[in-house]
Amino acid sequence: PLQHGSTEILKMMRRGITRERTDDLIKKIKDINPDISIRTTLIVGHPGEEEKHFQEMCDFVSRNKFDRLGVFTYSHEEGTHSHSFEDNVPETVKRKRYNSIMSLQQKISHEINQEKVGKTFKVLIDRGDKNNYFGRTEFDSPEVDNEVIIPVKNSHLRVGEFYDVKIVSARAYDLVGKIL
């Protein structure tokens, strides 16, 4: 996990990397494999995190456009270097920052998903009900990532099997497809 987009906060966390170096690594990875999906987690409200640090993280997220992003609010965790710091960011501020990053990521996720419309993916079917089957692409983890929703329409798909699915529409966190 990258955990933050501010070099100052990364230093306080003892992550051993700067925001600039992280940006460079992400760029190199995407240059080598433009189709790669990059996922990470971030922490908002780390002790000492000021508005400028939070804005650096927002800029970091906007610049790197992560395919999948989880955000957590800071809480003391024994055995970490940060446990020795005073937890000085109010919970209301942490929650506001969490919501801001998630709102930003929702827009990014929707943009990324829109780019998938018209493309075909191998989709693993996870489950179904009377109206739809639900699966995921090779880029997605179960339960936490995008689902591909496939209307039943006389299809008899088997859970645990892969199918070629053309994406016909996109939402922020889900795709809708049809079996080819």
Please place each PLM-identified region on the residue numbering.
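Terminal RNA-binding accessory module
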Residues: 84-180
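Conserved non-cysteine loop/helix-boundary elements of the Radical SAM core domain that shape
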Residues: 1-68, 74-93
